[in-house]
């Protein structure tokens, strides 16, 4: 019955293969062909298993056929050993045919049969179907190798396509991670255009979103990045704690009436608003409602859902403002004041559609608070909707508006779709986060802005400074930048006036109103920054610390400290040594024409304008001091110097003009007109010269080292015509030591026929030396003025500057009779051109003002030729006389 056993074995194997794997028809045929032969061989092999030494587990073929022919045992064992070797190839990984042959040869011996049989019984005897399965698997190996080779051919194509797409993206500047993100999202078969589109979208997303994403969650995150971006404010709202949210103060009446369409007091609207803020995480919410809203609803005051008010009151959210009835009349406290006051004190948000104009006008801080913290709203079908931009499109978002501190800086513009690859530059209207706070302007616009800033800075540091622009207590270092940036002094009036007009618009008009006059144009020396060195102390009432270096100690090109004069003040002092004063008088920079500015003619430039002052004008002038002691009074007038007609007097040497100073006018010069007739050095102040008020003086005792009368002849002469200017008679006081002289070289622009003015406020005296002969004219390196302090400037030599002529002032000894003199009491006649101008001005003013008034003012100011100043004086006179 071995044939039946083999058939059953074949059936079992086929059923097992049908369960475990697919068997092709060709494989099944091969298997059926091997079935009979293998079954016959196994039958012979199992016969020998009747040996009592063997395991009791034996197949059915051995039991049914106990007696078998043993002649072919060696042959059968050899075949079985070969089968065992084939099965051992799968189980024990032994593929050697030589070993199977050895087993066959050894199996002939009876002692070794048991060992071989044990090895064979370990697998084939107990599980015979495994042997055939292993053989069938070996038969499948060539087919599997074919399929694996086909599959191995496909990946190189996929890898090559992936590498191509990756290289293409890398050339465009994208990273490999971004390419992997896109390929995982779109798939490996995606077209290159689709990949590029996704890369562009992915490149515009913030780097923070990219770093958060990981490789494991690439597909999920890339598909939801846009939704996360749109929902990020809500996420931030959820993460906000109550500490970073502002308190909310709700105008209950306004919200309820708005929800009731201004007809019904709808308490449900208050509930909706409160719930909206509670959902956002706000904990500090207060609703103000007048107490009379708890009353029963009436036709004229409809109220709905009143139970909501009581519920919110129990939750300590709603507060009733006081209201009561007095003799049948309801007295209601102003609930809006409660709302604004609480919101202001708690730094919260007011929720209302009311503008609170009446309360905003009460306090400026309330107005500012209402403008910045008022949150308006709308109701859309029982939905409370505040605006996303409470303060307008350029203001903060609603989220940051309700926060104490903004969490994320908001981008006002939409991100640029091109990102870093945008080629629009500064013209791109989209937001570029990579540019940061860089100016969104072109290079040309930047250069224009820089040039405007430079021009404005140059104008502020220009060579002209308003006379009332610097306070009296200002130190020299405050204007060091101005001095440093000032150009060299120029005589061209157009350059000066252009800069000055810009400065004049920015300067206060306080002192203009005080002096009732027009400020004068003055120039700043550009190189007047040399600090005064310690030399001889002054003895003319200046502070003891004021010193001036002699010329030999000062390097060439360095100018002495600029002497400054305040408005309505006359004592010259260096800028660093100004005494401090409390008077609102400003320090200015005045040129040598301070006391002569009333001579500024609008038309001709007559060189005969040399006698600028008369006794009447002198007596009517005012000198006001900054303080009772140590103050500075200056004879600076506030009229313009007529630049347009080139009447400005400039010095050939820049050192001269800096050191020509106004002298202190003492009260005795006002009380006694004698010093003027004796050619005193006293400037005139015209601060209120148009007024009939008596001038106020701070009487000071005369300086002890100076005589009351220091007469000296003020003679301005040219070497060509010394006889044109007669000299006043000498005085007994002319022998006083150090009366002073100086050589002053001046010019009136390019006019060579220059004259000096009598009683010049900036005149310097040359001390007379008895060793000198009569008429000898020295030119020392420095001069001593009437008050005895040194003037550190040098006189230019004729050889170096031949176009300028020297003028000298000399105090002649009394025994010497001068060759020319001026009449003692008389004043020189005005030149014809001067009179012609006065006549023209008189005619023009008579066409505007009453002739009598014009005549009075022009008589009072005989040497004034400025029509504007005369008109101002006429207006003052007219107001005083009551015309």
UniProtKB/Swiss-Prot annotation:
Region Disordered, annotated ranges: 53-109, 139-158, 456-551, 680-738, 754-775
One term under GO cellular component: cytoplasmic ribonucleoprotein granule
Coiled-coil segments on the chain, per record: none
UniProt entry keywords in alphabetical sequence: Endonuclease, Hydrolase, Magnesium, Metal-binding, Nuclease, Phosphoprotein, Zinc, Zinc-finger
InterPro entries: Rege-1_UBA-like, Regnase_1/ZC3H12_C, RNase_Zc3h12_NYN, ZC3H12/N4BP1_RNase_Reg, Znf_CCCH
A GO term, aspect molecular function: RNA endonuclease activity
Pfam families: Regnase_1_C (PF18561), RNase_Zc3h12a (PF11977), UBA_6 (PF18039)
Amino acid composition bias (Low complexity), ranges on this chain: 705-714
Domain of life of the source: Eukaryota
Cofactor(s) the protein needs: Mg(2+)
CDD domains: PIN_Zc3h12-like
Residue ranges of every copy of the RNase NYN domain listed in the record: 245-400
Zinc finger intervals, C3H1-type: 410-435
Primary enzyme class: hydrolase
EC number: 3.1.-.-
Family named by the database record: Belongs to the ZC3H12 family.
Function: May function as RNase and regulate the levels of target RNA species.
Name of the protein this chain belongs to: Probable ribonuclease ZC3H12C
């Amino acid at each position: 019955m071995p044939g039946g056993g083999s058939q059953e074995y074949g059936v079992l194997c086929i059923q097992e293969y049908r369960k475990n794997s697919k068997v092709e028809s060709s494989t099944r045929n091969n298997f059926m062909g091997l079935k009979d032969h293998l079954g016959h061989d196994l039958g012979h092999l199992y016969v020998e298993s009747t040996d009592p030494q063997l395991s009791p587990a034996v197949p059915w073929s051995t039991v049914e056929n106990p007696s078998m022919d043993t002649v072919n045992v060696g042959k059968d064992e050899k075949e079985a050993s070969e089968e065992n070797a084939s099965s051992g190839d799968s189980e024990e990984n032994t593929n050697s045919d030589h070993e199977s042959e050895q087993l066959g040869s050894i199996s002939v011996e009876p002692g070794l049969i048991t060992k071989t049989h044990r090895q064979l019984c370990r697998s084939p005897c107990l599980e015979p179907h495994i042997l055939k399965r292993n053989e069938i698997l070996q038969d499948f190996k060539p087919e599997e190798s074919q399929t694996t080779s086909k599959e191995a051919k496909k990946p190189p194509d996929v890898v090559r396509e992936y590498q191509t797409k990756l290289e293409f993206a890398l050339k465009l500047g994208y990273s490999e991670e971004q390419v992997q993100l896109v390929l995982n999202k779109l798939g490996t078969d995606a077209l290159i255009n689709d990949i590029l589109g996704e890369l562009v979208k992915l490149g515009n997303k913030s780097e923070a979103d990219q770093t958060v994403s990981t490789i494991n969650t690439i597909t999920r995150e890339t598909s939801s990045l846009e939704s996360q971006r749109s929902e990020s404010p809500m996420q931030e709202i959820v993460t906000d704690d109550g500490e970073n949210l502002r308190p909310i103060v709700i105008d209950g009446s306004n919200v309820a009436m708005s929800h009731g369409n201004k007809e019904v007091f709808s308490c449900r609207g208050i509930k909706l608003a409160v719930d909206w803020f509670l959902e956002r995480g706000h904990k500090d919410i207060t609703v103000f409602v007048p107490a009379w809203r708890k009353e029963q609803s009436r036709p004229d005051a409809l109220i709905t859902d009143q139970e909501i008010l009581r519920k919110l009151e129990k939750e300590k959210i709603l507060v009733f403002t006081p209201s009561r009835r007095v003799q049948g009349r309801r007295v209601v406290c102003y609930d809006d004041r409660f709302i604004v006051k609480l919101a202001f004190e708690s730094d919260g948000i007011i929720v209302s559609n009311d503008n609170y104009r009446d309360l905003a006008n009460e306090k400026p801080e309330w107005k500012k608070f209402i403008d910045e913290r008022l949150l308006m709203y709308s109701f859309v079908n029982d939905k409370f909707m505040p605006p996303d931009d409470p303060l307008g499109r350029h203001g903060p978002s609603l989220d940051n508006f309700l926060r104490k501190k903004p969490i994320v800086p908001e981008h006002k513009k939409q991100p640029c779709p091109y990102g870093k690859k945008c080629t629009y530059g500064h013209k791109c209207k989209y937001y570029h986060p990579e540019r940061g706070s860089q100016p969104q302007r072109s290079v040309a616009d930047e250069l224009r802005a820089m040039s405007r800033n430079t021009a404005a800075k140059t104008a502020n540091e220009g060579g002209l400074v308003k006379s009332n622009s610097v306070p009296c207590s200002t130190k020299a270092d405050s204007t060091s930048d101005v001095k440093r940036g000032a150009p060299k002094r120029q005589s061209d009036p157009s350059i000066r006036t252009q800069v000055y007009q810009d400065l004049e618009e920015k300067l206060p008009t306080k002192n203009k109103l005080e002096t009732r006059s027009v400020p004068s144009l003055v120039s700043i020396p550009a190189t007047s920054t040399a600090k005064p060195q310690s030399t001889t102390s002054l003895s003319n009432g200046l502070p003891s610390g004021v010193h001036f270096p002699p010329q030999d100690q000062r390097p060439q090109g360095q100018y002495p400290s600029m002497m400054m004069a305040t408005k309505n003040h006359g004592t010259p002092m260096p800028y660093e040594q100004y005494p401090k004063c409390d008077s609102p008088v400003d320090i200015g920079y005045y040129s040598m024409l301070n006391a002569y500015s009333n001579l500024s003619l609008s038309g001709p430039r007559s060189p005969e304008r040399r006698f600028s002052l008369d006794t009447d004008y002198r007596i009517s002038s005012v000198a006001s001091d900054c303080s009772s002691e140590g103050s500075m009074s200056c004879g600076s007038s506030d009229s313009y110097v007529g630049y347009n007609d080139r009447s400005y007097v400039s010095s050939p040497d820049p050192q001269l003009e800096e050191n020509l100073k106004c002298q202190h006018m003492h009260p005795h010069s006002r009380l006694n007109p004698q010093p003027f007739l004796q050619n005193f050095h006293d400037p005139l102040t015209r601060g209120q010269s148009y007024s009939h008020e008596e001038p106020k003086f701070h009487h000071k005792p005369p300086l002890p080292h100076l005589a009351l009368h220091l007469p000296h002849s003020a003679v301005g002469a040219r070497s060509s015509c010394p006889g044109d200017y007669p000299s006043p008679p000498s005085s007994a006081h002319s022998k006083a030591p150090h009366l002073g002289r100086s050589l002053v070289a001046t010019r009136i622009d390019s006019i060579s026929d220059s004259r000096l003015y009598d009683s010049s406020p900036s005149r310097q005296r040359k001390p007379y030396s008895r060793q000198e002969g009569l008429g000898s004219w020295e030119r020392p390196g420095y001069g001593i003025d009437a008050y005895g302090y040194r003037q550190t400037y040098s006189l230019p030599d004729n050889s170096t500057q031949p176009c300028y002529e020297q003028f000298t002032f000399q105090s002649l000894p009394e025994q010497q009779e001068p060759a020319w003199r001026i009449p003692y009491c008389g004043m020189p006649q005005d030149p014809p051109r001067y009179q012609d101008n006065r006549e023209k001005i008189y005619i023009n003013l008579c066409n505007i003002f009453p002739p009598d008034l014009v005549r009075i003012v022009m008589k009072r100011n005989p040497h004034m030729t400025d029509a504007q100043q005369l008109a101002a004086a006429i207006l003052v006179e007219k107001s005083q006389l009551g015309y």
